[in-house]
Design a protein with these regions (language model features):
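Glycine-rich beta-strand-to-loop/alpha-helix junction loops that act as flexible
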Residues: 37-42
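Structured mid-to-C-terminal alpha-helical surface segments
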Residues: 1-35, 46-56, 61-214
């Protein structure tokens, strides 16, 4: 039986972030049950991850019109919502509970296919939410790694392979990705954000992914 996240995280600051994430996720889904969580936190909470992730990333075409309701509901839970900023397609805010803060990013234009999976709360309970399939999450992470070469994006791809249900839909993408794979710019960071188990090396992940894609 898996321990609750708050029992596995080693840093108090990470525990506080995890609890704040839970409050924000619950607030978002109380207002828009079609919102889609993606990115590192979605992988951590919805795909049995062991990599700490801080920010919250959503797709939601409704949340822009619900900004006032979001702020009101957040305040009722003791949260401080800094003023929303919009860049056209994206909506940004920083949210705090007085102890810690995190960034919220919402893509308010893009419509995506989603699936329902349990989101694991820090206390061990769960909440059914919408997120991306493992296959679509991998495609996003391939783009992210190709753009910035952060080790966390490569690790997320590596981790998600075990959840792929339609191998044919991403096998070619993985193979092509590996043929042009440059080393990460921050490999040493991985061991600081993996909070359980061994953090694999870049070479280990590359070999294992190539074997998977055969």
């Amino acid at each position: 039986m898996q321990l609750p996240i708050i029992k596995m995280l080693k840093k108090r600051s990470q525990i506080e972030v995890a609890r704040l994430q839970d409050e924000i996720v619950q607030t978002v889904y109380s207002l828009d049950d079609r919102a889609v969580l993606h990115g590192g936190t979605a992988i951590w909470r919805c795909y049995s991850g062991n990599r700490f992730s801080e920010d919250l990333d959503f797709y939601s075409t409704s949340l822009f019109s619900l900004k006032t309701d979001f702020e009101k509901t957040s305040r009722s839970h003791g949260l401080i919502v800094n003023k929303f900023k919009s860049t056209g397609n994206l909506l940004f805010s920083s949210i705090s509970d007085g102890r810690t803060s995190l960034n919220l990013e919402v893509n308010i234009r893009k419509k995506v296919e989603s699936i329902v999976r349990p989101y694991l709360n820090a206390d061990g309970t769960s909440l059914q939410i919408r997120t991306l399939s493992a296959e679509n999450m991998i495609l996003e992470k391939i783009h992210a790694y190709s753009d910035r070469r952060f080790i966390r994006d490569l690790y997320d791809i590596y981790h998600l392979l075990q959840f792929v249900e339609n191998k044919g839909s991403v096998k070619r993408d993985i193979s092509l990705f590996l043929t042009h794979l440059d080393s990460p710019v921050d490999e040493g960071v991985l061991k600081t954000i993996i909070y359980s188990g061994v953090s694999p090396s870049f070479e280990r992940m590359k070999v294992d992914m190539a074997r998977w894609a055969k």
